[in-house]
C-alpha cells in the first residue's frame, strides 16, 4: 500500500511551457484571445437558438449542444494553461489533472458521436424531406443527444480509470500542455501495451466508425442535392451541409492524426500541436463557421440585437415617464403650500397651468 501511495504524485510538472518570460507573452495572448472568442461565439449560438422561435428545430438543438460541448471543452484546459503561463512553477495538482483528463475525454467522445447525429439530421432533412418532421420528432432528438452525452461520459469513466490505475513510480513530469491519456501513459513504469491497445480500439469505435457513417451519409446527400431542380435550393442545401462538413473535417482530421497515426520521431511534438488545435482552435472556429455561412443564424442574431435595443429604449422611456409622473405628483401635493413655485416650474416645463384655491 505504501508503494502505491508513493507512486501517486501530489502534482504534475508541465514541461512544454518556457521558463523565459518573453517567450510566454505570445502564447498567453493567443490562448486568451481564442478563449474569449470561443466563449462569446458559443454563448451567442446557445442564446440565439434558445430565444429565437424560428431556430427551435432539430438542427439548431444539436448545434446548441455542440456549442455547449465546445464551451466546456475549452474551459477544461485553457484557464489552467493561462495560469501556468503566468506562474513561475508550471504545475497542476493531481486532482486537477484527474478532472481535466475526465472532462477532456468525456466531451471529446461526446462530440465524436454528436457530429454523427447532426449528419443524420441533415441526411433526413435532405433525403427524406417529406418525412422529416415525423422522423426527427422532439423525443428522438432528446434521445439522440442524451445517448451521445451518456456514451461519451461512460467512455471517459472507463479510460480515465484504466489510465490512472497505472503505477507512475514517482514520475510527475508531463511533456504536454495538459493532462491527456497518451502523455500520462508515458509516465508509467510498467508495460502499457494493453492500455495502448485499448486506446486504439476506443479510438476506432469513436472516430473511424462515426466518420465512415458520415461519409456514407454525405454520399447520399450529394446525390439528393444534385437532383434538386432549383439553384436556390441546391445552394441552401450545400450551404447548410458545407458548414457541418468543415467542422467534421477539422475535428475528425485532428483527432485521427492524434490517436490513430503510428508513432514516429516527430509524432510527439505533432501530437501536442494537434491536441492544442483540437482543444482550443477548433472550438473557436466552429461558431465562426456556422454563423458566417448560415443566413438564419445571422438574421436571428440581428433580431436578438434589435429586440434588446428596443427593450432598452422601452425601459428608458418607462423610467422617464415614471420620473415625470413622480415629479408631477410631488408638485400636486406641494401646490397647496407653495403655489407660486409650482406655477414657475410648470411654465418652465411647458405644462398646463392649474388654478389654485
Swiss-Prot record:
It is a multi-pass membrane protein. Signal peptide: none annotated. One of its GO terms (biological process) is detection of chemical stimulus involved in sensory perception of smell. Its main location: membrane. The keyword DNA-binding does not apply. The keyword Chaperone does not apply. Keywords: Cell membrane, Disulfide bond, G-protein coupled receptor, Glycoprotein, Membrane, Olfaction, Receptor, Sensory transduction, Transducer, Transmembrane, Transmembrane helix. GO terms for molecular function: G protein-coupled receptor activity; olfactory receptor activity. One of its GO terms (cellular component) is plasma membrane. Disulfide bonds join 97-189. Residues 1-25, 80-100, 159-195, 260-272 are extracellular. It is found in: Cell membrane. This is Olfactory receptor 2B2. It comes from Homo sapiens.
Amino acid at each position: 500500500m505504501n508503494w502505491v501511495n508513493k507512486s501517486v504524485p501530489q502534482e504534475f510538472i508541465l514541461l512544454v511551457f518556457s521558463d523565459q518570460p518573453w517567450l510566454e507573452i505570445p502564447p498567453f495572448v493567443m490562448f486568451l484571445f481564442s478563449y474569449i472568442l470561443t466563449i462569446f461565439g458559443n454563448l451567442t449560438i446557445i442564446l440565439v437558438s434558445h430565444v429565437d422561435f424560428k431556430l427551435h428545430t432539430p438542427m439548431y438543438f444539436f448545434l446548441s449542444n455542440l456549442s455547449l460541448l465546445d464551451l466546456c471543452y475549452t474551459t477544461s484546459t485553457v484557464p489552467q494553461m493561462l495560469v501556468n503561463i503566468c506562474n513561475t512553477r508550471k504545475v497542476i495538482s493531481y486532482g486537477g489533472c484527474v478532472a481535466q483528463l475526465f472532462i477532456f475525454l468525456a466531451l471529446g467522445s461526446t462530440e465524436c458521436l454528436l457530429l454523427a447525429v447532426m449528419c443524420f439530421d441533415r441526411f433526413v432533412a435532405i433525403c427524406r424531406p417529406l418525412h422529416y418532421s415525423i422522423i426527427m420528432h422532439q423525443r428522438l432528438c432528446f434521445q439522440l443527444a442524451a445517448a451521445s452525452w451518456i456514451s461519451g461520459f461512460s467512455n471517459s469513466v472507463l479510460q480515465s480509470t484504466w489510465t490512472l490505475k497505472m503505477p507512475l513510480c514517482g514520475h510527475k513530469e508531463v511533456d504536454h500542455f495538459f493532462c491527456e491519456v497518451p502523455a500520462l501513459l508515458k509516465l508509467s513504469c510498467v508495460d502499457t501495451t494493453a492500455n495502448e491497445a485499448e486506446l486504439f480500439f476506443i479510438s476506432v469505435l469513436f472516430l473511424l466508425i462515426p466518420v465512415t457513417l458520415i461519409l456514407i451519409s454525405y454520399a447520399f446527400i450529394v446525390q439528393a442535392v444534385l437532383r434538386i431542380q432549383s439553384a436556390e435550393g441546391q445552394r441552401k442545401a450545400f450551404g447548410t451541409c458545407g458548414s457541418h462538413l468543415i467542422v467534421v473535417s477539422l475535428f475528425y482530421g485532428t483527432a485521427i492524426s492524434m490517436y490513430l497515426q503510428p508513432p514516429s520521431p516527430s509524432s510527439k511534438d505533432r501530437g501536442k500541436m494537434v491536441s492544442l488545435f483540437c482543444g482550443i482552435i477548433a472550438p473557436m472556429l466552429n461558431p465562426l463557421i456556422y454563423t458566417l455561412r448560415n443566413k438564419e443564424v445571422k438574421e436571428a442574431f440581428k433580431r436578438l440585437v434589435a429586440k434588446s435595443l428596443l427593450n432598452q429604449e422601452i425601459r428608458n422611456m418607462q423610467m422617464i415617464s415614471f420620473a415625470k409622473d413622480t415629479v408631477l405628483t410631488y408638485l400636486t401635493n406641494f401646490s397647496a403650500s407653495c403655489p407660486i413655485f409650482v406655477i414657475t416650474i410648470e411654465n418652465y416645463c411647458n405644462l398646463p397651468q392649474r388654478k389654485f384655491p
